[in-house]
Curated annotation (Swiss-Prot):
One of its GO terms (biological process) is geranylgeranyl diphosphate biosynthetic process. It is an enzyme of class 2 (transferase). It catalyses: isopentenyl diphosphate + dimethylallyl diphosphate = (2E)-geranyl diphosphate + diphosphate; isopentenyl diphosphate + (2E)-geranyl diphosphate = (2E,6E)-farnesyl diphosphate + diphosphate; isopentenyl diphosphate + (2E,6E)-farnesyl diphosphate = (2E,6E,10E)-geranylgeranyl diphosphate + diphosphate. This is Heterodimeric geranylgeranyl pyrophosphate synthase large subunit 1, chloroplastic. PROSITE patterns: POLYPRENYL_SYNTHASE_1, POLYPRENYL_SYNTHASE_2. It comes from Arabidopsis thaliana. The gene is GGPPS1. It comes from the Eukaryota. Its cofactor is Mg(2+). Mg(2+) 1 binds at D155, D161.
Amino acid sequence: MASVTLGSWIVVHHHNHHHPSSILTKSRSRSCPITLTKPISFRSKRTVSSSSSIVSSSVVTKEDNLRQSEPSSFDFMSYIITKAELVNKALDSAVPLREPLKIHEAMRYSLLAGGKRVRPVLCIAACELVGGEESTAMPAACAVEMIHTMSLIHDDLPCMDNDDLRRGKPTNHKVFGEDVAVLAGDALLSFAFEHLASATSSDVVSPVRVVRAVGELAKAIGTEGLVAGQVVDISSEGLDLNDVGLEHLEFIHLHKTAALLEASAVLGAIVGGGSDDEIERLRKFARCIGLLFQVVDDILDVTKSSKELGKTAGKDLIADKLTYPKIMGLEKSREFAEKLNREARDQLLGFDSDKVAPLLALANYIAYRQN
């Protein structure tokens, strides 16, 4: 498959036209074109070039398949650990333990439970790429993590995925009850916008850019984003593979998973003072790694144990959900992930290679993660 693109109109049909999963939806061009492009690497100049240095991969592809390498001088693990620690401190400060204690305990339980912090790190890296400071991006970074945590709390509820384990710990509703878990998610959702609007420095970021950032975040989680993906996802359980295809699955995950990653990068670029061109290139980059994240997640769900993942393994298979391995097969899913990684990296061609290194490494981190 040389190209996989969702156009502005997406038609997904079922033989029974009254099935809730049947959709005729006008998308906001949430597409990530996948083409057979050449890998990229770094030369001595300060821009990203199109020739490559490659090493073997064992997660997304078989051992004989290839991937691109980052500059040997860039230590991505130190970078992401350092940034994640700063995000954790900022989140701890933003959501202190106060009255009513129970709701704040529930919010903090999931918000501070660890996790990769991919979304806030992406937000910070995008801000720094366009010339902004880490401190400028931190309120936006915290906001996207609050919303991500909300989505996990709600996703784990019995009425959704009915999961008992998240980030290696009992899920929120198992500890605090379903009623408080719902409210904790609601509180994180509303506070994310309050924090983004009030904590972003008005001395650095113009009100126009703050309003733009708020609008982007709201769109990413509503009926043009996360909610759209979730409702089509839960309506697709048990569908016959003959009735759905790759476009259907892409619609789900470009909205359910990629939309918030896209917002993370876009918010970072907006508050960092990025140009419209820089913002759109980072949008496309994040859209591709968002879809990549889900493809890899589906692969890990059928190849790793619950202990390795820190969450229940094989739950999508048990729930008869649509996944990339189910539709494409495991090997084709790995090949598709490799194409997504290359396409994402191509969006960063021409940026300063020193500043772009974290984002290139982040794409590979998502592609080759083990949990």
